């Protein structure tokens, strides 16, 4: 049995330090998909027998969202651009998700590892982010009683404003956590190096076919060796083999290519949050110069207005934060990012300097302009909702959209 040690701090992904001071528990999450169950909590989708869209509620066993969409499009003989969904999910899990398909047909047949729970028609299109959050049911391999032994940590998490809202390991690749390196190469214009890194990374790869590519850089021969299920890698190889190495990422679906840039932004966010935790005692404290969002009961931010903390409103904002009505945010850097002031500005400038990148690097010219990012903002902490332990060492809880269960478990287990 292969195990993933959640306690391991992926320094390489910008996550270091904890907000709690309790002891390490040495727990692990098994890599069996059945030990990590995720179910979307969608916005209301109105059924209409004459609706324009087909809505599928599907349970995916060990399927990456992007790969499933590609297979679903192929199965239904339509363009993948006609399929939308609310959020991407990790491969090593059992996930229940909703997919919206612009087609007048219903789904028929079967796909291995997919259970179609329900399908119906609707006039409501599903867009990225169209969900309240996700419910998780996670089994932890732990020799003791996790509910009892984590009680002090959970109390401290609540008192300190939640757990650090790090982007989890899944953000950086299902199996090879290197997408942030590729994203950095892309924004720096190193497109050929980025393509090579996608195909072979000596920090992760042990498969003979990847090693052979790294040694020989022979795309035509590698097309004979790379397994058929590595569809995206084979698309990159095909582009290189035809002499278009610098343009190779155009062979991927655009939303997948953009995720490389998003991964690098996520890495920068993680580093900035880690640095903030060195200087600020908890995750609910608002300091002068902070930018903030209002949040709902799921810790989902209201992005219509950024609030800036100053000496006149600081006390009020800290009171609101202590009631979980508001939270400081850290930018995901982009070419149009509004910088915070004070300590958080200093941290951001230092991280960008250390990485040798500027905000304008995220405005990508030419054929890859679609990967450009104006930036975004992410709250620094969140709390689990309705946390229960239905069985020994099994956790049942809800998190808002885009919040990683592995980041919550990391703080508990260390």
Swiss-Prot record:
The keyword Electron transport does not apply. Keywords: Isomerase, tRNA processing. InterPro entries: PsdUridine_synth_cat_dom_sf (IPR020103), PsdUridine_synth_TruD (IPR001656), PsdUridine_synth_TruD_CS (IPR020119), PsdUridine_synth_TruD_insert (IPR011760), TruD_catalytic (IPR042214). GO terms for biological process: tRNA pseudouridine synthesis. It is an enzyme of class 5 (isomerase). SUPFAM superfamilies: Pseudouridine synthase (SSF55120). One of its GO terms (molecular function) is RNA binding. Coiled coil: none annotated. PANTHER family: PSEUDOURIDYLATE SYNTHASE PUS7L, TRNA PSEUDOURIDINE SYNTHASE D. This is Probable tRNA pseudouridine synthase D. It comes from Picrophilus torridus (strain ATCC 700027 / DSM 9790 / JCM 10055 / NBRC 100828 / KAW 2/3).
